[in-house]
């Protein structure tokens, strides 16, 4: 399968994985391995600096995975920028998944504060991957600001509803000059396959892997879904049409056409 390129860096996997909600760090590590992912997101607020032996980061091989700190929990641009700076000061690479979600109930991203934070972080040398509503206009503004990707949601975080914003994501993909990563709401392998068939460059999944009784098994299923969707997109899906069209000719065998 062709490689994903973000900010000049190449990845063989197009599946990004989040680290929240897993019942244990060992289950998370097994899921990461089964997913084949090379980009792993982690909330800085979940890192236990005082107990490194029990810390989440102790279970993530930094030589194998790109650790992508996220600004989960930030309610405005100032908080998001502060979290990104803390991650870099803690030794993380200057890559950040930008999340600004002032509403704790639906966790929908704030477009104004996200753009404001992105502009600041790009100027400070961060590789910014912003989580956004499926808003084509905002996506263009973020690309113009210098973000490395745009990450439109398929559905609200953790809902497992799939690609409910399909029409808007299709516009974003059509207009994008950076990779498009569909993030949030993807609850089944068929959902990620759908996103990849549309032409998305990658997907990010967390809840669907973390809450299943078999995280590693589900991670493998998502890996296969991403690969199938990407291969179908590259091969070229047939156009949909209203009328039926037989795959074999119906004439000249049972009867002669006049």
Curated annotation (Swiss-Prot):
Asked if Cytoplasm is a keyword of the record, the answer is yes
What reaction gets catalysed by this protein? [ThiS sulfur-carrier protein]-C-terminal-Gly-aminoethanethioate + 2-iminoacetate + 1-deoxy-D-xylulose 5-phosphate = [ThiS sulfur-carrier protein]-C-terminal Gly-Gly + 2-[(2R,5Z)-2-carboxy-4-methylthiazol-5(2H)-ylidene]ethyl phosphate + 2 H2O + H(+)
Q: Which family does it belong to?
A: Belongs to the ThiG family.
The alphabetized list of GO BP terms reads: thiamine diphosphate biosynthetic process
Major location, coarse class? Answer: cytoplasm
Residues where 1-deoxy-D-xylulose 5-phosphate binds: 158, 184-185, 206-207
Classification via Gene3D superfamilies: Aldolase class I
Stored PANTHER family: THIAZOLE SYNTHASE
UniProt keyword annotation of Metal-binding present: no
Please list the residues that make up the active site: 97 (schiff-base intermediate with dxp)
List the record's Gene Ontology CC terms alphabetically: cytoplasm
Q: What class of enzyme is it?
A: transferase
Q: Superkingdom, according to UniProt?
A: Bacteria
Where found, per UniProt? Answer: Cytoplasm
The entry lists its GO molecular-function terms as:
thiazole synthase activity
Pathways per UniProt: Cofactor biosynthesis; thiamine diphosphate biosynthesis
Tell me the organism: Syntrophotalea carbinolica (strain DSM 2380 / NBRC 103641 / GraBd1)
Function recorded in the entry: Catalyzes the rearrangement of 1-deoxy-D-xylulose 5-phosphate (DXP) to produce the thiazole phosphate moiety of thiamine. Sulfur is provided by the thiocarboxylate moiety of the carrier protein ThiS. In vitro, sulfur can be provided by H(2)S.
The encoding gene = thiG1
Q: How the protein assembles, per its UniProt entry?
A: Homotetramer. Forms heterodimers with either ThiH or ThiS.
What is the name attached to this protein's record?
Thiazole synthase 1
Task: Write out the entry's keywords from A to Z.
Answer: Cytoplasm, Schiff base, Thiamine biosynthesis, Transferase
What does the record give as EC number? 2.8.1.10
